[in-house]
């Protein structure tokens, strides 16, 4: 029972912060959350992730819907796009510094959650 209570308290705390952070945006749908995990995984492993690769990796999400979610994440300041010097058409998606800090805090909180 304590595990369930801890998880519930964690979730409620996260949702209270939703108007001030990325919590609400990335919990809108499984696709939003999956996108966050894909971008952050690439970032943490120092891998390049192109917008096209991200669209392909998002399961059960159409390419137009993926493009909309990516655009929203960029507009809200969670991610930014970088062009390569070799091919100006290819854009890599990267988290902003502020989002990296938010994500790191989220992971620390999850790790400290005693289940």
Describe the residue ranges of each PLM region.
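Short alpha-helical segments that sit at the start of domains
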Residues: 9-38
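Amphipathic alpha-helical dimerization/coiled-coil segments
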Residues: 18, 104-115
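Short helix-to-turn junction characteristic of helix-turn-helix DNA-binding domains
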Residues: 39-43
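Short acidic, hydrophobic short linear motifs in intrinsically disordered regions
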Residues: 45-57
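Phosphate-/nucleic-acid-contacting segments
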Residues: 52, 59-63, 87-91
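Short amphipathic alpha-helical interaction segments
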Residues: 60-75
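A short, conserved structural fragment
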Residues: 74-84
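Short, cationic-aromatic polyanion-contact patches
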Residues: 84-107
């Amino acid at each position: 029972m304590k595990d369930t209570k801890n998880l519930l308290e964690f979730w409620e705390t996260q949702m209270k912060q939703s108007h001030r952070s990325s919590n609400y945006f990335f919990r809108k749908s499984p696709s939003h959350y999956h996108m966050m995990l894909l971008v952050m995984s690439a970032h943490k492993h120092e891998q390049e992730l192109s917008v096209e690769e991200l669209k392909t990796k998002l399961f059960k999400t159409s390419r137009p819907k993926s493009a909309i979610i990516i655009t929203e994440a960029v507009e809200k300041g969670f991610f930014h796009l970088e062009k390569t010097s070799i091919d100006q058409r290819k854009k890599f998606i990267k988290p902003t510094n502020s989002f990296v800090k938010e994500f790191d805090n989220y992971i620390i909180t999850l790790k400290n959650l005693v289940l």
